[in-house]
Amino acid sequence: MFHDLYREDPLSLEEREAYERDLISFCDRELDLLGDIKGLAVLYAGGSSPLWLEGLSQRIGRTGTLVALEADTQLVKEGQDLLRDADLAAPVRLVAGDVFRPPLERNTFDLVYSSGLFHELDVRERSAPEALTALASVVRTSGRVGTSDFVDSVPAVQLEDEELQHELTRELSGAEFYGIDSPERLITLHEALLDKVRWRLSPPCPIRHLDRLILAEDEPEELRSLPMKARRNMIERREALQERIRYEGYTRLATLYVEGWVSR
């Protein structure tokens, strides 16, 4: 949903710790699929989350390097501040840039990795294959591209939540998202551009107390800028989603990891 909009933490200290442990566990599960990446030059594409960067840095170690590509310049600045307190092994460099036109030298990295990039990708002007091609261009020959993302292989409240977020953004900015779909769509995307593609589908990873955090959120301020009819529709859908969360909890989606090798 529209996360981090609640005024006060609705969780106790113990509940907050359990929630954060589950987030770390989910991150670790996804990063473990990369295998041994010690000493590699790695690009993390499409984000500046300290949780993911810290996990990658620790796996890469002091003999490797990590660059993170983030489109939002404000998030780059915030990420730089947060990383000062992170437990890093490999040095991390944050770069502002677009995955369609990464401001990086070609043939630079041993591995390009993304988590959640494609379902948030705005394909209004350029396509998902163009994004994957651009990312592969900065990988050395015989290097690897690996992506993790949500798929709709199991029913989940999260799917409705993500769709509602995307619709609000579309109403505000006109963005068109690649979105969440079947595992086959992502596998086919990678097979068209990479060699020796392999993949793994992982079951949903529950996050304790996530439902309570979402139910505690305030109404997004962005709703006020919508036309009255669109705003009313969005509020009604948000309320229906909240009722579903109260009844079902915040059930999460499965994730798909796909990787392939670059050859030229």
Where are these regions (language model features)?
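Short alpha-helix
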Residues: 178-193
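Conserved alpha-helix/loop element of class I SAM-dependent methyltransferases that forms part
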Residues: 19-40, 55
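Class I SAM-dependent methyltransferase SAM/SAH-binding core
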Residues: 43-44, 48-101
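Conserved class I S-adenosyl-L-methionine
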Residues: 146-168
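Conserved Class I S-adenosyl-L-methionine
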Residues: 196-264
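A short acidic, Gly/Pro-enriched loop at the edge of an enzyme's catalytic core
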Residues: 100-112
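A short, conserved alpha-helix within the catalytic core of class I
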Residues: 121-134
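Class I SAM-dependent methyltransferase Rossmann-like catalytic core
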Residues: 1-25
